[in-house]
Amino acid sequence: MKLGLSALLFPKASVEEVIKFSAKLGAECVEIIYDVPHFQPDYDQRKLSGIKELLDAHGLGVSVHGSFWDLNPASHHRELQKLTLTQVRRSIDACRTLGGEIVVLHFGRCPVPYAKDFLEEAKRRYRRFIEKCLPYARERGVTLALENAIGQPTTYPSTVEELKQLVLELEGAKVAFDIGHAHLAERRAGMNDTGLAIANDIKDLRGHLVHAHVHDNRGKNDDHLPPGDGDINFKPVVDALRAINYRGLLIAELWNPEHPLETGRKGMKKLRDLFKTS
């Protein structure tokens, strides 16, 4: 397992600075978010070769989080869905150029989930969207990893069960497991100590889970705290990842734009403490 940081932590920095900061903080890899503020929609991808050289110079592995701000793969607006597809394909191209293997894709959103027919159509739109992305990624040697949501009815897939069913049905689709999101989903489902439930989710995704986001929260908001600053019981989670012989990247996906270096340093230390091998 390689331990790393997400560019989410550094919204005020350039992508080049994100890479340098991550290396300085002891990361072994970095997750680039192919979206604003680091990449404008019309970003000239010829510049990616310089970013690749910088990653190589620091010996960092890389993954890419596909574009998602202001976008929605399940949108009922055709033009928005078309734009989302364009930007996700550009994310896949960026991943290939940077030498990465994983592109993380966000869930779809349905604004009126209580209208059942509308929700079902949003689910179909999301599925068709992924079906369009998969061959594009496959041709470029990139794996699409679908991220679990926080258990809200406005998202699809909203539960780990829905996510697993989706990747079983879509050949080539894999899972990016977000531990903080799983904690929120289990809390919404009525669980108090969510550690064992999250561990069971991980074991249930054996063979599908290829990427992981690690962050903490207090069960109410998606705070993106360093592990230990919230109330997630990480021990069974770590044990479960070891039990399935997880070998992918572990990305600390943290948020503190006012003090990113301090938070990143703390997050990397917590990752090493949790996942260090004897």
Where are these regions (language model features)?
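N-terminal pre-domain/capping segments
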Residues: 1-100, 174, 196-197, 268-278
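Histidine-acidic metal/acid-base catalytic patches
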Residues: 1-2, 12, 16-23, 101, ...
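Active-site-proximal loop/turn and secondary-structure-junction residues that shape catalytic pockets
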Residues: 9-11, 34-36, 68-70, 107-111, ...
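Active-site acidic/histidine proton-transfer and metal-coordination neighborhood
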Residues: 16-17, 56-57, 74-174
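Generic enzyme active-site microenvironment
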Residues: 29, 33, 63, 145-147, ...
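A short acidic, helix-capping loop that chelates divalent metal ions and anchors anionic groups
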Residues: 36-39, 70-75, 111-116, 183-187, ...
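Short, flexible/disordered intra-domain loops and linkers
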Residues: 40-42, 115, 119, 154, ...
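Catalytic-core regions built around general acid/base machinery
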Residues: 46-59, 129-136, 200-204, 236-240
